[in-house]
Amino acid sequence: MTNIRKTHPLMKIVNSSFIDLPAPSNISSWWNFGSLLGICLIMQILTGLFLAMHYTSDTMTAFSSVTHICRDVNYGWLIRYLHANGASMFFICLFLHVGRGLYYGSYMYLETWNIGVLLLFAVMATAFMGYVLPWGQMSFWGATVITNLLSAIPYIGTNLVEWIWGGFSVDKATLTRFFAFHFILPFIVAALAGVHLLFLHETGSNNPSGLNSDTDKIPFHPYYTIKDILGALIMISMLSSLVLFSPDMLGDPDNYTPANPLNTPPHIKPEWYFLFAYAILRSIPNKLGGVLALVLSILILMIIPLLHTAKQRSMMFRPMSQCMFWILVADLLTLTWIGGQPVEYPFVVIGQLASVIYFLIILFIMPITSMIENQLLKW
């Protein structure tokens, strides 16, 4: 008799994705982040669902409803802070996951990579709209500043912004639609993640060496299931520590003040995970130029496969490229720091320099470095 998990139409899909899936025997802990992202998404959907049961998307009551969740709902404070800090955890895993893809050349799986970039955009949109919902000062002004950027689009810009706002300013209509979009997007993300996996399983996983691993595969279960559980436990313990000891460490104190359209906060800044893009946006004095740079800073990931000039896939055996990669990481950390600083000397200059270096490394320095390495290897 054949095992039911290999014959049942539903079990068969689960089996070929998580149980009998052939996986390279040498994939390191950097390959854990996919499963961690899945866990983050499930956790965000669940905590978000319970928050939505008590939240009201009305400008008059939104802030009070969040206060009510934290004060009066059983473990409401825990659900809220798990959701808020879960987003930070989500982005930490996302950035590490993308970084792994860049380092080991996983972007050569074109469909998987491009859907991944789409996923990144979708998660960023979700997080931005979620930040608006508590209707604190930073929520309101963040929404105003970021949506206003669309007015830089020639000809249709102003109409587009007013259409998104549902009026002539960020108001009740904006909050209601942002809540609707914030609720639906995670399910779209989940569907996209399914397609992401579908395309990944067409080719099989990459591995640290970047070489073909068909000759040496092991079943996903029990080897990588247990490895993923360990990763999940580490992540959950980190998240629990953050939520239970310093839940407001990554938040903005301004968001504990109810939204006031008549009072602009001295420093408007997004959550930490958007600061690098915000710094790139601010480093260009022209509005349209800034918006283009902002979008391109992430869209540039899509053309990375075209810029791959190396004869080897992974950076494992390419010390010069490794060096450039870590300079890029340091540059992104610098941009993140600058994004949170006021617009004044010397931060403006540092931001402009870091932005130029970011695009230079990706577009020119990395491909040239790879070509030099090819020459050195007489390849």
From Swiss-Prot:
Its cofactor is heme b. Gene3D superfamilies: Cytochrome Bc1 Complex, Chain C. Binds 2 heme b groups non-covalently. A ubiquinone binds at residue 201. Keywords: Electron transport, Heme, Iron, Membrane, Metal-binding, Mitochondrion, Mitochondrion inner membrane, Respiratory chain, Transmembrane, Transmembrane helix, Transport, Ubiquinone. Its main location: mitochondrion. It is a multi-pass membrane protein. It is found in: Mitochondrion inner membrane. Heme b b562 binds at residues 83, 182. Pfam families: Cytochrom_B_C, Cytochrome_B. The keyword Electron transport applies. The keyword Ribonucleoprotein does not apply. Heme 1 (or BL or b562) is low-potential and absorbs at about 562 nm, and heme 2 (or BH or b566) is high-potential and absorbs at about 566 nm. The cytochrome bc1 complex contains 11 subunits: 3 respiratory subunits (MT-CYB, CYC1 and UQCRFS1), 2 core proteins (UQCRC1 and UQCRC2) and 6 low-molecular weight proteins (UQCRH/QCR6, UQCRB/QCR7, UQCRQ/QCR8, UQCR10/QCR9, UQCR11/QCR10 and a cleavage product of UQCRFS1). This cytochrome bc1 complex then forms a dimer. This is Cytochrome b. The lineage of its organism: Eukaryota, Metazoa, Chordata, Craniata, Vertebrata. The gene is MT-CYB.
